[in-house]
């Protein structure tokens, strides 16, 4: 099916339409590679128990970065950093550490240190907990263009590794993960394995994540508190955005405002999350911040047969769709369904030029496999759908236009299979923001 080039016309639209139309026509002849094995990365037996592992970073405000890591033995909760490799100890920051218990499992020491202020578009080198091991990351740009890698339902299989390899070859500035991270599903050492698996990427670019159903991990009698591992291991800048929960927050970068919502915490009208969303949307000045993206886990629009009628989708949509539409959000990303689907701009199940695009991309590589069955006929609001593993890239070129592309893990190569230009609703004179 040909994709629309939202906001572009002429040669650009013709080129994109022809590319997508030709590829869509070839989908039926595509022979999908077989499923991949699960991956479990353990710590080498001869490793130093004080060495940092599972290192990952995330944005905090406009000019700070949270550094998180884990050790088996307790070390100092400090990070040394500078702008040259092999730097001498100088600038440093101190933070906190914690542990958590889950049934018979006791986590390692989890460290949380915020460093900054930092300069934009700058490479920093850093060391964790007094270790000599050096890492590096690059801060996002202060303005457009900026590129986001977008992935959902990642898991830890050989398909996951393929997805990560493809992302690593992209010149992206930060990654957004739409929930369902480790697929530990109560088996806590799998959280450690996941942290080791993603460290090569997550230690070099900020990863901003939200939770999915696989992060709940609530068990009657044995463990009654939900999201224990997720909240301990993946701290996000919720307090900085006025949220009272790590399960929903927002951040702003280079003229883009991103709202990360929680599909598995109370979203009803009058709930803390609902009231926070109302307040957060009111703070967004679309003249200063022309782009608005919303992240959920359970999709509000979905023509796959998987996960139909779930309350996390149906009830959350009923509660919050009016808020999102009224704020003129540009794109709503979701995961959960293990396939890819892109909708046109939608509001209340109908095409609407002032509604957000809806994109489902829960195809990162999880162990449960793909959701390959779709409802027929294909709804008119669904513009492209395919059950294949992959990831997305969103390059916000300027204040008015962005390019979205979906990269399929086709025969172990990252293939661009769906691509569309998007115009910011803030730049659409027919939609008053």
For each of these PLM feature ranges, what is it?
Residues 74, 154-157, 181-184, 213-217, ...:
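Solvent-exposed loop/turn segments at secondary-structure junctions
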Residues 150-152, 174-180, 206-213, 262, ...:
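Active-site neighborhood of phospho(di)ester-bond hydrolases with catalytic His/Asp-centered motifs
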Residues 109-114, 120-140, 189-292, 307-314, ...:
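Extended active-site neighborhood of metal-dependent phosphoesterases/phosphodiesterases
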Residues 132-185:
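An acidic-aromatic substrate-binding cleft motif
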Residues 163, 337-346:
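Short alpha-helix in the alpha/beta-hydrolase fold that links the catalytic acid
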Residues 65-67, 76-78, 87-89, 157-160, ...:
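Short, solvent-exposed loop/turn elements at domain surfaces
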Residues 2-150, 169, 387-388, 393-433:
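Acidic, histidine-bearing metal-coordination/catalytic regions of metal-dependent phosphoesterases
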């Amino acid at each position: 099916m040909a994709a629309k080039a939202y906001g572009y016309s002429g040669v650009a639209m013709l080129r994109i339409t022809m590319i997508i139309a030709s590829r869509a026509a070839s989908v039926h002849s595509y022979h999908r590679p077989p499923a991949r094995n699960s991956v479990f990365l353990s710590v080498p037996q001869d490793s130093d128990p004080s060495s940092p592992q599972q290192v990952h970073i995330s944005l905090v405000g406009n000019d700070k970065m949270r550094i998180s890591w884990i050790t088996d033995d307790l070390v100092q909760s400090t990070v040394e950093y500078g702008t040259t490799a092999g730097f001498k100890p100088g600038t440093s920051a101190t933070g906190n550490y914690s542990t958590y218990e889950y049934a018979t499992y006791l986590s390692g020491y989890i460290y949380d240190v915020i460093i900054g202020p930092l300069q934009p578009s700058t490479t920093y080198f850093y060391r964790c907990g007094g270790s000599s091991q050096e890492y590096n990351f690059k801060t996002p740009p202060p303005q457009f263009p900026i590129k986001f890698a977008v992935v959902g339902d990642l898991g830890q299989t050989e398909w996951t590794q393929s997805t990560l390899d493809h992302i690593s070859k992209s010149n992206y500035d930060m990654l957004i993960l739409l929930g369902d991270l480790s697929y530990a599903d109560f088996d806590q050492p799998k959280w450690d394995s996941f942290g080791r698996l993603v460290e090569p990427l997550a230690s070099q670019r900020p990863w901003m994540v939200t939770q999915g159903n696989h992060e709940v991990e609530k068990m009657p009698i044995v463990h009654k508190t939900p999201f224990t591992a997720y909240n301990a291991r993946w701290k996000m800048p919720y307090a900085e955005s006025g949220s009272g929960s790590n399960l929903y927050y927002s951040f702003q970068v280079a003229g883009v405002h991103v709202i990360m919502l929680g599909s598995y915490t109370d979203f009803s009208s009058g709930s803390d999350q609902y009231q926070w969303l109302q307040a957060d949307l009111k703070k967004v000045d679309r003249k200063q911040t022309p782009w608005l993206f919303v992240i959920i886990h359970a999709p509000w629009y979905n023509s796959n047969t998987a996960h139909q009628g779930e309350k996390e989708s149906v009830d959350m949509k009923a509660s919050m769709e009016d808020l999102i539409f009224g704020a003129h959000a540009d794109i709503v990303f979701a995961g959960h369904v293990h396939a890819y689907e892109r909708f046109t701009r939608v509001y209340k199940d109908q095409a609407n030029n002032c509604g957000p695009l809806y994109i489902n991309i829960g195809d990162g590589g999880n162990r449960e496999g793909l959701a390959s069955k779709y409802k027929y006929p294909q709804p008119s609001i669904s513009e492209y759908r395919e059950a294949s593993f992959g990831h997305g890239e969103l390059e916000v070129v300027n204040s008015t236009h962005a390019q979205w592309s979906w990269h399929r893990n086709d025969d172990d190569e990252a293939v661009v299979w769906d691509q569309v230009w998007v115009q910011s609703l803030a730049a659409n004179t027919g939609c008053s923001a």
